[in-house]
Each structure stands twice: as C-alpha cells, then as structure tokens.
Amino acid sequence: MKESIKAFINEIERVKGKKTLDFKDIIELNGPRLTVDNQLTEEEFIDAMIDYCKKEKEKTCPYCHRKNVVKYGFTKNTKQRYKCKECGRYYCTTTNTPMYYSKKDMKKWYEYYKLIENMTPIRQCAKKLDISIGTAFQWRHKILNAIMPMLKGKMEGTIEIDEVLIPESFKGNHSKNLSFRMDRAPVRRQRSASQYIGCEKVSILCCKDRNENVFTRTGDKGKVGYFRLYELLADKVTERSVLCTTNNMGYIPLARKLNCKLYKLRGRYEVVDEKYHIQNARAFGRGIVNTINYKFKGVATKYLNFYLSWFHWQEASKRHTRSMKLKDMLSMSVYSNQRLRVCDFKNVTSLPS
C-alpha cells in the first residue's frame, strides 16, 4: 500500500515540475508508466491524496508561495496546521482545495466525487450522502471552480466554432441576498420568439477541432464581439489553424490577428470543399443546452462557466474508464490551488463586466 501511494505522489511531483499543466498531463497519472496505480483501492487513493496535500503544504505557503514554513499544531479536526514565517499566515493541509473549511471527512468527499463524475443531480447527491441540499450545491461548485483552470488543452488544425444561445437565468434563492437586483423584467410564459432575441439571451462559445480537443465558455449577452472572442481564444488557438465559424463578423479580425485561415459559413449545415463545416461543434453545443435544460432544469447564468468546464471535462475524458476519470478529477481539484468559500459565492460571475 505504501509503495503504491508513494508512486502516485511521485507521478504528481513529476507533472508539477512543468511550467504549464495540461489536462493530458493529468491523464498520464493513470497511464502505463504508473503500473501500481491500477491496484489502488479507494482507501489507498484517499490516503495518497491526503499525503500529497500534507507534503505540498510542508514545502511552500499557499498564499505567498515561499518555503519558510513550520508546523504549528493541529486544527479541531486533527488536521496538521502550519505557519508561514514570511507572511505570518496560518493554514492546514486542505487550504485552497475544495475540502477547505469542510467538517466532513475525506471518505464522504470521495463518495461525492463519484456522484460528480456521473453528473448526479444535487438533490440525489444530498439524499445519498445524507447532507443538506445547500451543502451538496456548495460542494459541486467548489469542485467545478477547482477544475476549471486545469482544462487548458489547445486546439489546432481545423477548428470548428459555434455559438448557442440560452435565456439569461437568475435561478436560485435570493431571499437572503439584500443586494440582489434583477436587471430585466420577469419572463412571462407564452411570450413570442422575438421577445427572447437580443440581450436577454446569453451566448455560449463551443469550439472543437478534428482531434477531439474542445473548449467552451460563456461569451456575452447576445452575440459575441471581437474583443471577447480574442480574450477567450487567443491562447487556445494554434497559429496557422483553419477556423470554421458562424456568420459572426467578429471572426474576420480574429482570424487576421491569430494568423489563421477563415471559413465563415452562412448556415450551420453548410459544407465547403466537403470538409469544412461546424457540425461537430454544433452537436457539442446542442448537447450542452439539452443537458442544462432537461437534466439540470436550468442553470443560473452566474454559475454557467462552472458547468461549461464540467462539460469540457466530460467530453475530454469520455474515452477513459470510470476509475480513471474519478482520479483525474480528484487530482486536478487538489492540485489547482483554487478555493471558493461560501462567502465568495455572491461574487461569482460568468459574463464580462
């Protein structure tokens, strides 16, 4: 057991030595080079992640990233406590992870990760783990917030880009938020289609290349403009790629700026030279919209990027086994050094300011 845990931690250390971390690097943690990983049980993997967190916090401070760190007792939950002698701040082994400030044990978190991997609805998660609906909601968004910056795969070759529109949503309980103001009139039933067009809809950018690499993010209210497109795709599109896009005029200066060839299609079913189209990106986008509308019964616009990163991860790991996907998500969320406290939820946003 100790050898398998040590091998797993060594593989994470090997990946961490790189300047940039790609999703494919995380996949390699479960690749053929780590043969003992196939024998890891649930308990061993939990111990491996705890040992890795402990080892990381003993090295550097998660706040100032300096190495002058000493042990400083234990928390009420018997977690090792540390003090940084440079910035004077205190932290424990779970600082800047989804488990930060959690009073539940790692076993219950591990079970929740299993439910996240299956995209289980919040109420079912709460019922199976005997936790409140509010806790299940917060855990989901803490995990999705952690994995979002880890999905950095670039796209190359022929890249399809489509935009799908969904109504702006203010779903949620706002009774305790005294500062909440809805910036539009309430949506009534049986409205005409023309009343939903324009700024009341939010665009989702869906990108996919022929190597199955994907990227998706919230665009803007209405159509996405050039500046927002460049902000989202500047570091995602490889130079000299071929862009197959919708009839949005913002892609013309984008292709010129990124030194890419552009095929701007007038219809979603148009095909140029029998190979340039956006049907794969369109299918990816329709899958996202259908899941949001019919499985989750709508998603608040402010949390939309969290769910898009979830779809991104599901699409990128669809060919991997269930156990491999579970370990990928656990590894990414622990390594990302991201935190989302309950008091931070009110500041979450997906649309540009």
Question: Locations of the language-model features?
Answer:
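Residue-level recognition of single "structural anchor" positions
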Residues: 1-353
